[in-house]
Amino acid sequence: MSKAKCIMVQGTMSGAGKSLLCAALCRIFAQDGYRVVPFKSQNMALNSFVTRDGAEMGRAQVVQAQAAGVEPDVRMNPILLKPSSDVGSQVIVNGKARGQMSAADYFRMKRSLIPDILEAYNSLAEENDIIVIEGAGSPAEINLKADDIVNMGLAKLVDAPVLLAGDIDRGGVFAQLYGTVELLEPQERARIKGLIINKFRGDVEILRPGLAMLEEKTHLPVLGVVPYLRVEIEDEDSLSDRLDAKAAVKPLDIAILRLPHVSNFTDFIPLEQHPLLGVRYVQNTRQLGAPDLVILPGTKNTMDDLRWLRESGLEAAVLRLSAAGTPVLGVCGGYQMLGEQLCDPAGEESGTPCTLRGLGLLPTTTVFGTEKHLTQTAARAAAPFAGAALTGYEIHAGSTEVRGSAFCTLADGTPEGCVQGNVFGTYLHGLFDTGELTEKLTAFLCRQKGIDPAGAELIPMEQYRQQQFDLLADGVRAALDLPAIYAAMGMQKGDNT
């Protein structure tokens, strides 16, 4: 079996649209009949996923795998950094946590991870036709280039041709692309096979003179101008846009607390797509108002975010709303906060040993430890969502003692989470993806508010996701010079037949 061909997408900066371009290429190559997988050697993100075999990986490569029509595999993202503070992260290698590291300590040791990166990449290359590689940030961060393992450093290791993308929506795209190319070493510059203008709004003809000058100055072809595509696909780069977005006015108002270390906010994307549910993210009591449901999401630092909740006045506001009958849902770290007590005897979560009082809305006690619980599971929800089937995954380091009713029952019969009155808590991420729990929750909130939910039909999440991947692929396929991209990989479209 011949080894896979590859193409790498690098960007002029974070947020240039690399993740979605890679997802689009994965979909396009899959549509063209190739076995394709994504790859990113090192990802820094708070949003993560647990694979079927219990390994943790970044969600960007999960989305790209879904676009390619393959099951997420930790080899697609061998190194994941989950920031726990401004200067440190939890380092996850091959799906398992290696511990907390400062940025300085990680930079000193990261080249020792090259064998892990190459083992993951080479094993994928033996099983597939094409690997779509995503870079990180910019390849022209000259202070980081010496020990680079994710941009040109990786391209050299796997001999990858590179496409360089710039975001025109932010302005200055010609300077971005030209400056990036000029800051590269000659051998790095030689790897770039073409430039991509991303997120363009307007008439492409207006760009023609600029494109011609850019090609003349860089001696590189512009392989496409990709329009600003309005597709509903979760995107690591869209985090701030999504959290800042103004919620559409809909009959039911859901307020999600925007915790400082919020993680896996992607849990709630299915709620945003429901015709009756308006979802907004709030940071203070003024924004909170009087919603129909309050959600405490997951967090990478439960203890610090609980302190913030208390100091910001949001804890008191949530307690008042709950006392007045407003439903409250906590997921993972948010679930832990809703309990009576959180204990960190070894300082695993907060840096120093401590015990904090929770919100006291659920009869639970959480104790943090060193071992992280990673698993995929299926479950059936209990009242008031009785019968709803859900699938999800757990990523948490604490164990929680529950002195009350369960939120759901796992496939093996184990009770999970907690319910007390109108307060619900669960460790399950991805709980709304199947749609059944979303419908049960919507019906429950409608009853609470006296609204008739009739006529509000929800497209199944998986069907909707596939539609969006096809829309993305259609838009990018129409914009890019695909024959040139195939040629850059040493291929021709159709040579797999």
Annotated model-derived regions:
Residues 1-322, 327, 347, 370, ...:
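Flexible phosphate-sensing "switch/lid" loops adjacent to ATP/NTP-binding sites
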Residues 332:
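Catalytic nucleophile serine of serine hydrolases
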Residues 4-9, 343, 356, 361:
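Short, Gly/Pro- and small/polar-rich lid/capping loops
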Residues 348-375:
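Conserved P-loop NTPase catalytic core
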